[in-house]
């Protein structure tokens, strides 16, 4: 594995498991120091301990991204400790669940909860860390979803919001030399996908893929490492699908 991130710092939200942990493992393998957050403190501690046992340098913070004061407190602490931050991966999000497809049962409280974590938190964190990212001419990666292109009431709409926000961030942050892109994963074999999709839905969506492969969190992490690296120095304001061609057919 190349060491494209030697001497660099990567901030990864939702890093206790799934795609967040895969990002952490990939960036650590390529030499990055890690700053990890999650709302699940015990799971985050286990993940950080396992990463350190593999040789990674990482610090872990419990942050509830639904709460603006916690986001700002975390960002202020990082900015005070680190003059430069090279990568911010806005990976944390609330997954599908019942309200993703049950329009009639979607309450204002539930909608605002999805919106705050999936769309507002990435904006607040990027805003608050803009100075150290600018000093490093860093990269922001937003993790959206193939669901942003299909009818998925709460989850899909908030991820579509994050797609649009990616364009807005790229437009503003480009003046600072900060690249902003998003990854839109398709169906991935992660605990969240298995827990939130009925088996028949999982099988149907997987069957729509143009490539008959099992997508994994490592596939998304590999794409993220490319987009955050100097190999992608001329790429910004893009939403890159990682879905085996599923977007072409639509997730029904």
Predicted regions and their residues:
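Short C-terminal tail/terminal secondary-structure segment
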Residues: 2, 95, 100, 236-252
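Canonical Rossmann dinucleotide-binding motif of NAD(H)/NADP(H)-dependent dehydrogenases/reductases
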Residues: 3-35
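Substrate-binding pocket helix/loop in short-chain dehydrogenase/reductase
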Residues: 99-103, 107-112, 205
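Active-site helix of classical SDR
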Residues: 126, 158-161, 166
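Alpha-helical segment proximal to the catalytic Tyr-Lys
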Residues: 131, 171-175, 233
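Short, small/polar-rich loop/turn modules that mediate ligand/substrate recognition or access, typified
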Residues: 137, 174, 179, 235-237
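C-terminal helical subdomain
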Residues: 182, 203-235, 240-244
